[in-house]
Regions:
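Generic protein-terminus/edge-of-domain signal
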Residues: 1-81
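Conserved metal-binding segment of the jelly-roll/cupin
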Residues: 83-96
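Ligand-binding loop in jelly-roll beta-barrel domains
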Residues: 94-117
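Amphipathic alpha-helical segments enriched in hydrophobic/aromatic residues interleaved with Lys/Arg
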Residues: 121-183
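N-terminal positioning helix adjacent to the helix-turn-helix/winged-helix DNA-binding module
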Residues: 139-142, 189-197, 232
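Basic/polar phosphate-binding segments, predominantly the helix-turn-helix DNA-binding elements
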Residues: 207, 211-234
Length: 234
């Protein structure tokens, strides 16, 4: 895909009532050694890597190739966090941030910028937080397809396109949360143990106790209960 940056998307009061309004969406490929941001970066979003910037919107970025660094106010301006292909990060309105690709690799990035009460509520409820802005999601075709669909909808700008974009933002946030959460559990073998527990409970739900399930998994009951609740929500 050629680099595409769509700026100043039309947003009207009805769009805001929907709960999410999209301001910008796009894709760009930064080749190794290329300046960042590129010189054709829209003035509304231009920034210096050294000085960073503050936006008045959320942006969800997805890096599909390459590597680089990310910094934000909450985690510390002097702290550069490694970013690589298969990671997403969320920028928050009013939050200083800076990010850039490694000169040796460049990177490919998708992004979508948005505002609205829907996302504000997710932040207020603790699903997304300034102190956890990065997500390990790996490379997924469904995420790439969503960004591509958003770009196509924004190019066409047919009647109701903002509502289509709002639905895509919802789905992208859901997948960022889902893939990152499961990545954390898989790294600690939690997913495997919980899967075993669910099979035991399903097969012997009339005769097996939670304490027995914990014992078969070589876990203390308190540890099993805590882990099961974190994974399933129950």
């Amino acid at each position: 895909m050629a680099s595409v940056h769509l700026k100043y998307l039309a947003v009207n009061p009805v769009d805001l009532k929907w709960g999410t309004a999209v301001n910008s969406v796009g894709f760009q490929e930064i080749a190794p050694g290329m300046d960042y941001p590129p010189r054709n970066h829209p003035s509304r979003y231009v920034f210096s890597v050294a000085s960073g910037r503050i936006l008045q919107e959320y942006q969800l970025l997805y890096i599909t190739e390459g590597k680089g660094k990310f910094s934000c106010e909450t985690l510390g301006r002097s702290k550069s966090i490694p970013v690589k292909g298969g990671m997403m990060f969320l920028l928050f309105p009013g939050e200083w941030h800076s990010y850039y690709p490694d000169k040796s690799t460049g990177w490919k990035e998708y992004w979508i910028g948005f505002n609205g009460a829907f996302v504000d509520n997710l932040v207020q409820q603790g699903f997304f937080s300034k102190d956890r802005p990065l997500f390990k999601v790996n490379i997924h075709e469904d995420i790439v397809n969503l960004y591509t669909s958003a770009i196509n909808a924004a190019v066409a700008q047919e009647s109701g396109f903002q509502q289509v974009l709002a639905g895509i933002v919802d789905r992208l946030l859901s997948l960022a949360y889902f893939y990152d959460r499961n990545s954390q559990f898989q790294e600690s073998d939690t997913a495997n143990k919980i899967s075993q527990a669910k099979v035991m409970i399903h097969s012997h739900y009339m005769t097996i106790s939670p304490e027995e399930v914990a014992a078969k998994l070589c876990l203390s009951y308190s540890s099993f209960r805590k882990t099961f609740k974190e994974y399933t929500g129950f």
